Amino acid sequence: MKVNDIYSNAFNFGSYINTGVDPRTGQYSANINIITLRPNNVGNVEQVLNLSFSPLTTLNNGFGIGWRFSLTTLDVKTLTFSRANGEQFKCKPLPPNNNEISFKDKKLKDLRVYKLDSNTFYVYNKNGIIETLKRIGSSDIAKTVALEFPDGEVFDLIYNSRFALSEIKYRVTGKTYLKLNYSGNNCTSVEYPDDNHNHPHSGWFALAL
């Protein structure tokens, strides 16, 4: 078995999701906050996007081996649902279109996942945020392409030809809040053209892999 295929509910506890060493598994994990998306008109609702590290993966998703962008995904081949916060759950066989997806081992009712068609899925979270997942190109993985907040404000997530996240835009104005630049498969810098209402100037940092 490849380390990328290791799955256990033990990794869904908060001690593993937060930065540090999980005393139960002995595994180290780390999260680096990249951006926090907030709507203009709703308080106390936000979506934090992190770079997350797991020693159990040998994949390089553009940020170095073991690092991934913390976005919700659904692998329709392995039936693995991965939440933005790091939790993973196995789905039962996908239902017909326009039906809710069921999970083998998930008991909490803090979200519901619906299959619109073979390429599009909706994740309804308890905090009111709706995530739209789509399969991009020939990929088996449906990725987050939109985040809709309770007041209807939407952030669109745009991917490049290599299926890597390249921009996050605010749908109403078209403003870019996050831009990721790549050299080949590797992300080389991250830009904040608008900085999510906090600063009018651009900011950026470079990644050394």
Model-identified regions with their sequence ranges:
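Surface-exposed recognition patches
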Residues: 1-209
